[in-house]
Amino acid sequence: DKKALHACQDLGYDFPEITTWIRANEKDFELVKQAGVKETGILVSCSDYHIFKKMHLTRKQAMDKYLGIVKAALDRGIRPRCHFEDITRADFYGFVLPFAEELMYLSEESGLPIKIRACDTMGYGVHYYGAALPRSVPGIIYGLHHYARVPSEQLEWHGHNDFYKVVSNAGTAWMYGCSSVNCSLLGIGERTGNCPLEAMAIEYASLRGTLDGMDLTAVTEIAEYMEREIGIEISPRQPFVGRHFNVTRAGIHADGLLKDEEIYNIFDTAKILNRPALVAVDATSGTAGVTHWLNSYFRLKGDEVIPKTDPLVTTLRDLVAELYAQGRNTVMGDEELEIMVRTIDTE
């Protein structure tokens, strides 16, 4: 990790900014001083599960310990980013708010911004209007911003996907005054994962109506890199990056795509993600499915587009139907369809 950190520092980039993460103790803080970073994350677990059962401290002892390391960081001119671990199981008014208020006093005294990362460690957070604290994402962000007076730009949301709410919770945190949400490439992370970066890039565009300079074709490049270089297996149906996220199998849907892509494609995936809409050919594809596959796979445009009435379409459709009549039950692969097309063409 130290070698990776120094290699990144040697590149000399301003962004993305390199930060570290430590436990709230002197031994870990010594490593931060040696690293030469301008900001460090500090683990400040907030729930009684962590304070009593993991660290065997009282709430006062925990807060004093946390504040001691924060003060040490400020004395060195290092910006603290306090990770309020397990906030969705913490006593919000009994511990979270008083602690956040103390941090804001220190921030005002030192002149350095202290960030607060609200960590939904176990994914218990909910975005529903009227939900009670500590599980309420709106309540957590509103409370930190308005009661503890934490500036929006110093608030972060950190979610987990244990209950399938990681994206909706992150979007809700934005809407209630949290300027930043933590993401990971493809949503990789502990247990069920963290919030996917690609999801929040699309969510941002949906909420703001603009990409603000983002090139989302990079999402596709990132997915390809993660598969090729790191060996990450992406679920075929994972939104925006999965192999089949914009692939339709139903013949009636394929017919709609032929008439107007907007009918059955979520947006212009070719333009925005460099991923043209595709049709998988199987027993239900019919003439429309085969026609769309031919035009999309061979990237035919304008006068080159093959109509549904073309003899090549009907011949290929009949060959596919014959395979399924003989007992095939898997989707046709692009490569085998291409071989069939070239065989028909030579005949």
Question: Each PLM stretch: what is its role?
Answer:
Residues 1-26, 278-281, 285, 296:
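N-terminal capping/small domains of soluble enzymes
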Residues 5-11, 26-153, 171-176:
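Alpha/beta enzyme core
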Residues 10-13, 71-78, 101-109, 142-150, ...:
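Generic secondary-structure signature for well-ordered alpha-helical cores
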Residues 17, 41, 180-183:
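Short hydrophobic alpha-helical runs that function as membrane-insertion/retention elements
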Residues 17-20, 82-83, 154-158:
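Short catalytic-loop micro-motif centered on adjacent basic/acidic residues
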Residues 18, 22, 59, 89, ...:
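Hydrophobic alpha-helical scaffolding
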Residues 122-265:
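Catalytic alpha/beta core domains of metabolic enzymes, predominantly
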Residues 210-347:
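A mid-to-C-terminal "edge-of-domain" accessory segment
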